[in-house]
Amino acid sequence: MSKTPLTEAVSAADSQGRFLSSTELQVAFGRFRQATSGLQAAKSLTDNAQRLIDGAANAFYSKFPYTTTTPGANFASTAQGKAKCSRDIGYYLRMVTYCLVAGGTGPIDEYLIAGIDEINRSFDLSPSWYVEALKYIKANHGLSGDAASEANSYIDYAINALS
């Protein structure tokens, strides 16, 4: 079992033969509210994924128009290139939804950051392209309140990792 502040509090209380304190219970309720917001955000992003991906790709093409005219397998000058671009944007969006469900940055840390520099160099991809796509998603996801705060924190984390 992975350690979290909640599992550590339970373990400490159990080893001391006591019930959780009111402070520890408040932390648990706070985590529950955060988890609920994260799950709401993940569901909304998933339900709107195609719209967000398409819009992010168009924002990407507008900011970096050379990507749609430069020939090559790693550019969006062909239908296949545009499909790859959308696939990659979808990958970043999926990582954000995984973080929202997990309640931490682990999915981005393990699946995105770990090899992103090597992948981008190998395939001549610019991280700034995906930063622009993530900025579009953040500005257009349609979330509000705690769900928006949760989603934005992981989107910002991914943007910072790529910057």
From Swiss-Prot:
Residues that bind (2R,3E)-phycocyanobilin: 85
Keyword Membrane set for record: yes
Membrane topology of the entry: Peripheral membrane protein
Main location, first listed in the record: membrane
GO CC, alphabetical: phycobilisome; plasma membrane-derived thylakoid membrane
Modification after translation, per record: Contains one covalently linked phycocyanobilin chromophore.
Places the protein is found: Cellular thylakoid membrane
Keyword Transit peptide carried by entry: no
Cross-referenced Pfam families: Phycobilisome (PF00502)
Superkingdom of this protein's organism: Bacteria
UniProt keywords, alphabetically: Antenna complex, Bile pigment, Chromophore, Electron transport, Membrane, Photosynthesis, Phycobilisome, Thylakoid, Transport
GO biological process: photosynthesis
Family in the record: Belongs to the phycobiliprotein family.
Subunit-level organization: Heterodimer of an alpha and a beta subunit, which further assembles into trimers and the trimers into hexamers.
Protein function: Light-harvesting photosynthetic bile pigment-protein from the phycobiliprotein complex (phycobilisome, PBS). Phycocyanin is the major phycobiliprotein in the PBS rod.
Protein name as annotated: C-phycocyanin alpha subunit
Species annotation: Synechocystis sp. (strain PCC 6701)
Taxonomic lineage: Bacteria, Bacillati, Cyanobacteriota, Cyanophyceae, Oscillatoriophycideae
